[in-house]
Amino acid sequence: MKLGENRLDNPEPMTPRAQTVETPPHPLAGKRMTGAEMIVQVLVDEGVQTIFGYSGGAILPTYDAVFRYNDEHRDEAGNAPIPLIVPANEQGAGFMAAGYARASGRVGVCMVTS
C-alpha cells in the first residue's frame, strides 16, 4: 500500500472462512409453543436426562412445561423421560447438578429462581 491509501481503497479478495451447510428444519418448526415449552424442547434436543430444581414463582411455567412433556412422553413402564429432582434448597440443586455432571459425564441442569 502507498502512503494515504487504506484497505478500503484497494480491498484484497476475501477467501471463504466457513462453508454454508443446508440443515433440515426442526421437526417442530411452525408449531406454536410457549417460551417454557421451548426451553424444555431445547433441553430434550441437547440430550438432557435429569433436571435438578427448586421451584419459585418465576420458574413455575417452565416446571409445568417439564411436567407436561413428561406426561406426554412416558415410556411403557410409566417412567418420565426427564425426571425433575427437587432438593431442599437452591444451593442443593446446584450442587446436585454439578455432582451429577461430574459423576455421569452428562449435562447437569439446575433450574431455580429467586
Give short role names for the model-derived ranges.
Residues 2-114:
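Thiamine diphosphate
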